[in-house]
């Protein structure tokens, strides 16, 4: 079969299967394959040839035990990694070597991955248009993210509820972003990082977004360039919610 959609959906009996001999080189649809497999945890997919896979959406959604080796996965035939690890609360494997340069949709990729903290700042996400919810409730994540976001239009809940996150994302290009809903809601970055963000983002000029942008409870330095940039951004967008002046 070339379609593995829902193959083991909600299969509680799947714990440590040996998939090492499986030839998946012709499979195109892996969507929801292991979704809801609460006890699944295996390294036996490490050598799978996924190069023909076009749909990986929610492949491991709601697999709270899963922490398997997927370092060899090939995404050259797909443009979406939507929700693959959503709810994988135990997942924390190094996938920094993945080639994601052709991926446009990273939506909800690590949502509720509360242990995940791997160096994926090296990823080339220059094709991305959606990174909405990618780190929503990824409570342990705190790695640099010097990403090229120049094509991104949706940053809704991108850095939401990240209790450990404190990085400088001032280099992010946000000109095309039309959805900033709950962007950094319930997240706090340092005043230095927030100041840098405000100044750099305001300098990007005109914005596509109209509405309020949440920076959680992050605080800015009053009476200087950061406050001036914040005032300017409020005029461009319509509003900012944050922790006020430091």
Report each predicted region and the residues it spans:
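Negatively charged
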Residues: 1-246
């Amino acid at each position: 079969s070339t379609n593995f959609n829902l193959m083991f959906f909600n299969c509680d009996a799947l714990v440590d299967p040996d998939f090492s001999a499986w030839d998946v080189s012709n499979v195109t649809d892996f969507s929801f394959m292991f979704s809801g497999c609460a006890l699944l945890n295996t390294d036996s997919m490490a050598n799978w040839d996924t190069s023909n896979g076009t749909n990986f959406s929610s492949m491991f959604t709601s697999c709270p035990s899963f922490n398997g080796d997927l370092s060899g996965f090939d995404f050259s035939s797909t443009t979406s990694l939507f929700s693959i690890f959503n709810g994988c609360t135990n997942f924390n494997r190094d996938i920094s070597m993945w080639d994601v340069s052709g991926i446009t949709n990273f939506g909800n990729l690590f949502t509720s991955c509360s242990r995940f903290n791997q160096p994926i700042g090296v990823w080339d996400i220059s094709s991305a248009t959606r990174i909405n919810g990618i780190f929503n409730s990824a409570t342990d994540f705190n790695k640099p993210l010097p990403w090229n976001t120049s094509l991104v239009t949706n940053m809704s809940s991108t850095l939401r509820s990240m209790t450990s996150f404190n990085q400088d994302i001032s280099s992010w290009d946000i000109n095309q972003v039309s959805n900033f809903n709950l962007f950094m809601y319930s997240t706090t970055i340092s005043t230095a990082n927030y100041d840098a963000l405000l100044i750099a983002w305001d300098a990007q000029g005109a914005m596509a977004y109209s509405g309020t942008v949440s920076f959680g409870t992050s605080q800015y330095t009053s009476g200087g360039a950061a406050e001036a940039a914040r005032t300017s951004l409020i005029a461009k967008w319509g509003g900012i919610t944050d922790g006020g002046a430091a």
